[in-house]
Amino acid sequence: LESQAMDSARARLVEALKARDPHGRLRLYHPFTQRGAPIYVHAKILIVDDRLIRVGSSNMNNRSLRLDTECDICIDTALPANAGRQKTILRIRDDLIAEHLDLPLERVAAVIAERGLIAGVEELRQKPGRTLRPYRTPDLNAVQEGLADNEVLDPEGPEEMFEPISERGLFRRMKGWFGRP
């Protein structure tokens, strides 16, 4: 039941992000083995262009952000102390893509430099063997929608375990960012 709730919440979050991507640039990929089996990746990594990298253990759920012990690190090149780290961020990004595509780093970096990130990844992943496939948002049934929308298994804190479900909501704290999906 917990994985159903978290998977449903992820689907809602992805759809909310896509709805606010007017240029169609948001991409989420899932790695697959040579035989086509999905690879479970527990790591949480966010790379924004050559400007920011975040690596850590926290998840985008209330339990992780408020109740569990998590450790994240972020390098933001907009901060003076991190100036000049853009090439390092790009190398990490390209190395991760190369690993999941089972290709040499140099080839991945060259194709992305020539074609751009999205076009480069789309070109490089069109091959047999290990690859990246776009994350597809699953269709949610009524139970999954209820789990996602009401945080039944992911209250914001211990005090909310007994709060009426009608007062809960996946994006309640993020309304200023996303609004209701």
Task: Show which residues each predicted segment covers.
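PLD/PLD-like phosphodiesterase catalytic module centered on the HKD motif
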Residues: 1-181
